[in-house]
């Protein structure tokens, strides 16, 4: 009975398999092989991606990193800081835990592991890597969409009301809540709570989606009521146009913020000032005089 239990424990996928002493002299180690659930099938070999020589890059003659293979929409091989480089993990051997030894040795580094793809949906999260390139693409697109709305809002409000975007909050606090000059029947505190609840609910629903493609492009009657993405070829063009406009909007709003900090004026006022004297009213003159 004892021999049968010992043999079963030695062959158990949970307990692990004892490594012969000849492999690691002077220490007793176990190689744990966990076998919960069904055994995963070997991944199918996919065709090797080929990168064409006429692929557009961010700079003529630039060398694209290996992890930017052109598969993402709007990928021009620009990653000077290597932020999208796949994470590399060290694999350690198990520490020696043999009570019969005078000294137990720590596990050594036995190799490295690199995730091939970071968009692996699980019941709890859509990505296997928090700082992976797929997660960065989602953040870039979401921030770009907010920047497009913010840029349009900053220009529209200043054009229609004359109030700059950086002073909009002060006007609301002094004169009360309003929209395009029309008073609203809500206080600032009520509007803040409405914004928190509405945006919080939307973000909660978006983060509940585990499909990385649907997280970026949900589509449907709410987000594509005109059916513009029905044609796959047209969809690719629209996605490329969106990411280009998103990047331009993020740079534009960064310029709005720098202008507001340097001059205290809005973007339209700064633009009119520059057009009145283009040779002497530039960003260089502004910073040199401040």
Curated annotation (Swiss-Prot):
UniProt-annotated binding residues for chlorophyll a 2: 143
Residues given in the record as chlorophyll a 1 binding sites: 78, 140, 247
Subcellular compartments: Plastid, Chloroplast thylakoid membrane
Subunit structure: The LHC complex consists of chlorophyll a-b binding proteins.
InterPro entries membership: Chloro_AB-bd_pln (IPR001344), Chloroa_b-bind (IPR022796)
Gene that this polypeptide is encoded by: LHCB4.1
Listed GO MF terms: chlorophyll binding; metal ion binding; mRNA binding; protein domain specific binding
Residues with Phosphothreonine modification: 112, 114
Binding site for chlorophyll b 3: 203
Sites where the protein binds chlorophyll a 6: 274
Keyword annotations from UniProtKB, A to Z: Chlorophyll, Chloroplast, Chromophore, Magnesium, Membrane, Metal-binding, Phosphoprotein, Photosynthesis, Photosystem I, Photosystem II, Plastid, Thylakoid, Transit peptide, Transmembrane, Transmembrane helix
Free-text note on domains in this protein's UniProt record: The N-terminus of the protein extends into the stroma where it is involved with adhesion of granal membranes and post-translational modifications; both are believed to mediate the distribution of excitation energy between photosystems I and II.
Any Pfam family: Chloroa_b-bind
Identification of the protein by name: Chlorophyll a-b binding protein CP29.1, chloroplastic
Any one GO CC term of the record: chloroplast thylakoid
Transmembrane segments: 146-166, 184-204, 248-268
Main location: plastid
UniProt cofactor note: Binds at least 14 chlorophylls (8 Chl-a and 6 Chl-b) and carotenoids such as lutein and neoxanthin.
Family stated for the protein in its record: Belongs to the light-harvesting chlorophyll a/b-binding (LHC) protein family.
UniProt modification remark: Photoregulated by reversible phosphorylation of its threonine residues.
Entry membrane topology: Multi-pass membrane protein
Classification of source organism: Eukaryota, Viridiplantae, Streptophyta, Embryophyta, Tracheophyta
Residues that, per the record, bind chlorophyll b 4: 206
Binding-site residues, chlorophyll a 5: 259
Described purpose of this protein according to its UniProt entry: The light-harvesting complex (LHC) functions as a light receptor, it captures and delivers excitation energy to photosystems with which it is closely associated.
